[in-house]
């Protein structure tokens, strides 16, 4: 669903997670810069109310990630999330998303943030075998 304002998108994802008794969770994707900055209120509310939401913020290209004045939502929103991580290379995407879903389903409920899924990662091809889960631990 397309929203005109990021806070409204977070509120809808919050409501979806609550209506599904936290067994299913809302997912929000925003543009970088002002779009990810506007998500703060919704993330803080979800964190305070223990509502699981997967947030995928847009951001600068990975080569410009630490260049000032670029805004880093993953770093900025660590205090209002139960888990946050950046996908630095395309071959990390499967394992990062696996950890993100683990945190959404286990432990204290709350927002999980995965950044870095911009053009540098999304246009890189990955072999399908790379996405298979690892062996079970005894």
Please give the residue ranges for each predicted region:
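N-terminal alpha/beta PP-like core and its mobile active-site loop of ThDP/TPP-dependent enzymes
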Residues: 1-138
């Amino acid at each position: 669903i397309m929203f005109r304002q990021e806070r409204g998108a977070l509120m809808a994802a919050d409501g979806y997670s609550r209506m599904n008794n936290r067994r299913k969770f809302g997912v929000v994707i925003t543009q970088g810069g002002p779009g990810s900055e506007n998500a703060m209120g919704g993330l803080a509310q979800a964190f305070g109310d223990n509502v699981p939401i997967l947030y995928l913020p847009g951001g600068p290209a990975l080569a410009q990630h630490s260049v000032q004045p670029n805004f880093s939502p993953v770093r900025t929103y660590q205090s209002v999330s139960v888990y946050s991580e950046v996908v630095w290379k395309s071959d990390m995407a499967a394992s990062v998303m696996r950890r993100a879903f683990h945190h959404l389903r286990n432990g204290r409920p709350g927002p999980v943030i995965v950044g870095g899924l911009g053009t540098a990662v999304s246009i890189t091809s990955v072999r399908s075998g790379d996405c298979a889960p690892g062996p079970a631990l005894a």
